[in-house]
Amino acid sequence: MTWEERKDKRLKTKIAHEEVAGMLNQWYVMIKRHEVSQAVSIKCDIEHQLPNMEENQDLLLYFNLLDYRHKLLTEEFAASNKLFEDIQEQKADMQSTDDMIEYYYFFFAGMYEFHKKDYTNAINYYKLAEEKLRTI
């Protein structure tokens, strides 16, 4: 097998969504630690892997939620607001999501509302996140 054939085969091989999920978890750890340079590096790696990943809508929603949190970390506030609006639409289109994704959605929605200085809605979302956390 030539180098080009191996390269083509590697590009056509789908990456298991569990592998990308592991990378997403590493990314979130760096975000929580405020390790900006490592978070940016891992995000770049993930973005290169996503097109080759087996399709998984929950994982794509998780990626978008973490990307929103990443944008808050890197102070890309305008982009984070637009992304969160997209996430709300994406979530509305999905029939169901797992409890962990629901937790992150409510928690990050609370952060979004807090950023907008809508503290009442922020608290409501944080309470929903807390309730969801009990089921995880």
What are the roles of these predicted feature ranges?
Residues 1-102, 106:
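Flexible inter-repeat linkers and adjacent short helices
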Residues 116-118:
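Structured catalytic cores of enzymes that bind and process phosphorylated ligands/cofactors
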Residues 48, 128-131:
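A generic structural signal for well-ordered alpha-helical segments enriched in polar/charged residues
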